[in-house]
């Protein structure tokens, strides 16, 4: 199946087009900048970014109040109305600052290009949430039937970077929402990739509730994998010849976790405990010695 053309030119050509507007100072020309009523500008319906930091918007709104909007938004005119194609955050902050008007550059752009311009602007943002970036990558890959290798060249990132970001989309919806809401970092999220959904969400609760670091999360995920491989001979964790029944070990493990945030792993005739909070380990040791 032939690949879709990106508006007859190719996706790679769109990137320098956006940069041309902002980097070559074209917006300084009087015939390119207009002052539009804030309510005349309609949001881009194809904007892939759904969540914006309230604190960040407040800071930008205050800056706009004091210094004005330094970089105009990009809009396209259609039937007497203006549709935003780049600058969603600036538009929201200007509304928050109760500005009656907003500086804009009216560009001659086909309507179907609005989505890809929004996607590209999104990808180029430094503060973009990793999951939003993954979704933007996915939309570009699917819309234009390109490979990850081709996309990596366009966005000037390694293929490994694109692949790793895309793997975040395999996480459970609960984990994805936590990442979007910045309850966990991308480092935490990457540790959970590949785990069963139930284990992902169990570890997620621990990350949030216990404020685990990425390293602690890696240790916890490793323990879950070890416990799942108890019957694997090559790891030496076969339980059939131990004196502890599997259900007894499971109850013991659950009790340890509930009370002391400890995990127990059975290695031959030894039980190895892993601790995730020093204060609780001290409480456990005092209990054992009392």
Curated annotation (Swiss-Prot):
PANTHER family from the UniProt entry: CHROMOSOME-PARTITIONING PROTEIN PARB-RELATED
InterPro entries: Chromosome_partition/occlusion, HTH_ParB/Spo0J, ParB/RepB/Spo0J, ParB/Sulfiredoxin_dom, ParB/Sulfiredoxin_sf
One Gene Ontology MF term: DNA binding
Superkingdom of the source species: Bacteria
SUPFAM superfamilies: KorB DNA-binding domain-like (SSF109709), ParB/Sulfiredoxin (SSF110849)
GO CC, any one term: chromosome
Record GO biological process: chromosome segregation; positive regulation of sporulation resulting in formation of a cellular spore
Function: Involved in chromosome partition. Localize to both poles of the predivisional cell following completion of DNA replication. Binds to the DNA origin of replication.
Family annotation (Pfam families): HTH_ParB, ParBc
UniProt similarity note: Belongs to the ParB family.
Keywords, comma-separated and alphabetical: Chromosome partition, DNA-binding
Protein name, entry field: Probable chromosome-partitioning protein ParB
DNA-binding as UniProt keyword: yes
